[in-house]
Amino acid sequence: MRNRAIKSFSICICQIFIIYFIFFLLLCVNRICSALSNGFNFLIIYGGTFFHSGKYSIPILDVDHQLNGNSSLGTVGLYFHVPFTPPDIIPPVPRSPNNMFLCFFSSIVFASAFVFSFIVNNVCKDFLFLSLNSGFSFTGYITGLYPLYRISRVSSLASKYCVVGTLGSDLKS
């Protein structure tokens, strides 16, 4: 029984490192593509609010800004952004069971990324585009770190797409 618990814990640790590795690969790809004529980038939507830096150069994560108005705090979506396309014109992602693995995997990735960002925020902030300020609390992230198998309606804009992860609870009334 003890050996089984140790083995399970080891597998869990390995999975976390694999997730971090994939996250950093995505980050590197994003940075390289941004430098090369704003190629394919990753776009994060928080309750229908787009965050971007430069001319359609979009980092993987950018939570340095306060969310506007009646957005749903804590809801994260992962999308591909076509170069030189305005951020508000994005092909919708079909809501189908085929996306459930993407929803689950993205939830794990972003949850791990935010916890990791809490540790390295002051060291690598400029490189990672990660921050836990602007009204977000670390407690909110911890209580909201759970895999998500549902598609959340977060706003009239974001509800058109597949929301693939949730960090924290929706605060939209």
UniProtKB/Swiss-Prot annotation:
- Topology in membrane: Multi-pass membrane protein
Q: Where in the cell is it found?
A: Membrane
Key word Thylakoid present in the record?
no
How is this protein named in the record? Putative uncharacterized protein YPR150W
Superkingdom classification of source: Eukaryota
The UniProt record's further free-text remark is: Almost completely overlaps SUE1.
Q: Would you tell me the Gene Ontology cellular component terms?
A: membrane
Where do the TM regions start and end?
9-29, 32-52, 100-120, 127-147
The main location class comes to: membrane
List the keywords (alphabetical). Membrane, Transmembrane, Transmembrane helix
The source organism is Saccharomyces cerevisiae (strain ATCC 204508 / S288c)
Q: Where is the signal peptide?
A: none
